[in-house]
Amino acid sequence: KTDNVVYKRLAKFFGKLFIISFAMGVVTGIVQEFHFGMNWSEYSRFMGDIFGAPLALEALTAFFLESVFLGVWIFGEGRLSKKLHCLSIWLVAFGSNLSAFWILVANSFMQHPVGYTIANGRAEMTDFLALVTNPYVVGQYAHTVLSGIVTAGVIVVAVSAYRLLSGQNVETFKT
């Protein structure tokens, strides 16, 4: 949002690293979805109605939110107002956190199953709210999001230190 050229360079540089990371997440996420059907087909058959709901919500809400607004952020620079361009990356961040939430709802169910009953040889969801408010979600979500923030910070510091020590764009990376 600012007109500071150093911040703009940093945003472009680290934005490219984020795009690479996002692309890797998409690729591994798609492979993971295939694993559910191929490697864990019995689990998917037995728990699919419950386990699939949060993963479907992740794909339909969070992933599309991230993807659309990442595209807006990448291709909207210079075409959108600075406020709208800034808002687009904040919506990517929101979508990433929402994505983490839905994935962790599914994972929390695997760790501590709630809100279901066994009927006709399969697990059937009886309480979606119990699934979403599973006590394990809170701890896993806090751990995952805070770990992601710390990891991102370490990467920014490490890359900046490398660039400083190698004498590349010193004025930009000392900020």
Each language-model region and where it sits:
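Polytopic transmembrane helical bundles with strong interfacial aromatic enrichment
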Residues: K1-T175
